[in-house]
Each structure stands twice: as C-alpha cells, then as structure tokens.
C-alpha cells in the first residue's frame, strides 16, 4: 500500500519531485493524443499514471492521479464529468494494487502460481466486463429512450451487435492466451517471468476496467449529461457504437503498452531500491 514506508511522501522532496515529473509527463502525452471520435482518443497518458501507481502505491497513486486530472481540467477548461475524472486515478490505483501483490511474490521461484492467478483474473474480468456491457440497457430501454427522445426506437438488430462485440472480445482474449502460452514455453528466469506476469496483469486491468468498462459507460453518460438525452447513435446502436472502437484501439495498443511498461518499470524499481538503500544508510549513520 505504501512502498516507501516509513518515509512520508509529503515530507520528502525527492519523492514529490518524482511525482511531479510523472504528472508533467502525463500533460505532455495528453497534448499529443489523437482524437478518434468526440468521446474516444488514442493517448499514452496511462503510461505515466501506471508508473505513479507502481511507484507510490494505490493510495498515493489515486491521490496523485486525482490531482493531475484536476490540474488538467483547470488548465484546459473542458466540461468536468466524474466518470471521465475518475479514470486517471483508477489507472494509478490499479497499478498500485498490482505492485502490492508483486512485492509479496517477487522473491518466489514458483512462477506457475502467478501464472494461474493471472489466468483466473483474465477470465474473470473478461467475463465480468462483457456481461456488464451487454447488460447495459436492455432492448426495451433502448426502445423507450428512442421513442421518448426522438420519436423512434432501436432500429438495428441488437443480436447482431452483441455477436460482433462478443467476437471482438473473444478474439482479444484468444490473442492474449496465445501470447501467454508462448511466454509459458519460454521461461528461463522465474523472477523475470513473475515481473512479466504482473506487468501484463496491470495492463489488462487498466484496459478492461478503465478503458472498456468505465470508458464506454462514461462516453454514453457524458453525452446524456451535456444534452439531457441519449445521443442518436446510442439510440440506434446502443453501447456497441462506443464500445467497438475501444476494443479495436486497445487490442492494437496492448503490445505497445507491454513493450513500454517493462523497461520503464525496471527504471522505477531501480530508483526505488537505490533511494531506499541510500536512505537506510544515511539513517544508520
């Protein structure tokens, strides 16, 4: 929960500088984001937020994520909406939780336990995310919302959209399973494999919980928040109009995230160990 214990983050200048640098990086990454739709953009801001959570734990990570989001809102002046505002802190929180488990398991040599933990989380969260999104408003709700707002109802076969969504999720899942199977056969250093598994676990939780689940619901509810009624695309196509682009974008970005997370987390881990070593030596003197 608190990787730097007994150090107090608020009373340590170097820790505060690291947090400030990572938050500044998130602002820079946000500048170079690419808008795909009005409520979806391709951005690498999760990278500095993942590092914040990994370095500072879930409690301080969530706090720094909330501060960064608030500063971004104050400087850019966009409409504040809580489901969007909670996403950056959630990136930090999830990364911090995974780091906490990794700290307990990092010295283990039995990496197969961690492999099956990851498999359980992978299957559980994929099923949970898919079920929640497929249940997000029923056909009747769509029809009622359409008749009330636009005088027309849901005019696309929902079963076709459900099938496409499930096919995309299953393809994403199968691709990850193939990758995990390949990593399983290539294990040479157990500790290295444990780090790889927890980095993958962090990336998956951030994608499933924040990008696909919260992000999809936020996109829909944000437009309702602005206009007081569902968007026409939502009435016609349901949550699938907002979900499908997210699945495709995240599937394409996942390999890149994994390639970047590992070297950056190694740097963060080395900084953490070196700083704690120096602190302990100075304290003993």
Swiss-Prot record:
Molecular function via GO: transmembrane transporter activity
InterPro entries (alphabetical): ECF_trnsprt_substrate-spec
Protein name: Uncharacterized protein MG313 homolog
The species this protein was found in: Mycoplasma pneumoniae (strain ATCC 29342 / M129 / Subtype 1) (Mycoplasmoides pneumoniae)
């Amino acid at each position: 929960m608190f990787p730097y214990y007994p150090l107090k983050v608020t009373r340590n200048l170097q820790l505060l500088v690291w947090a400030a640098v990572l938050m500044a990086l998130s602002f820079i990454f946000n500048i170079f984001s690419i808008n795909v739709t009005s409520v979806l953009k391709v951005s690498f801001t999760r990278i500095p937020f993942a590092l914040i959570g990994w370095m500072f734990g879930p409690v301080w990570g969530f706090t720094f994520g909330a501060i960064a989001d608030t500063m971004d809102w104050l400087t850019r002046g966009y409409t504040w909406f809580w489901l969007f505002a909670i996403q950056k802190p959630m990136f930090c929180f999830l990364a911090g939780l995974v780091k906490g488990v990794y700290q307990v398991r990092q010295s283990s040599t039995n990496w197969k336990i961690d492999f099956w933990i990851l498999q359980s989380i992978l299957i559980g969260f994929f099923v949970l995310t898919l079920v929640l999104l497929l249940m997000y408003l029923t056909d009747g709700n769509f029809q009622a919302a359409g008749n009330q707002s636009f005088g027309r109802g849901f005019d696309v076969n929902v079963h076709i959209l459900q099938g496409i969504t499930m096919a995309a999720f299953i393809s994403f899942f199968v691709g990850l399973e193939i990758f995990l199977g390949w990593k399983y056969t290539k294990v040479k250093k157990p500790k290295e494999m444990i780090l790889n598994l927890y980095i993958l676990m962090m990336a998956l939780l951030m994608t499933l919980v924040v990008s696909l689940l919260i992000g999809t619901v936020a996109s829909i509810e944000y437009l309702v928040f602005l206009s007081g009624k569902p968007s026409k695309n939502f009435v016609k196509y349901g949550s699938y109009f907002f979900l499908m682009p997210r699945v495709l974008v995240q599937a394409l970005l996942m390999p890149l995230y994994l390639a970047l997370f590992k070297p950056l987390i190694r740097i963060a881990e080395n900084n953490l160990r070196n700083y704690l070593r120096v602190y302990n030596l100075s304290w003993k003197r």
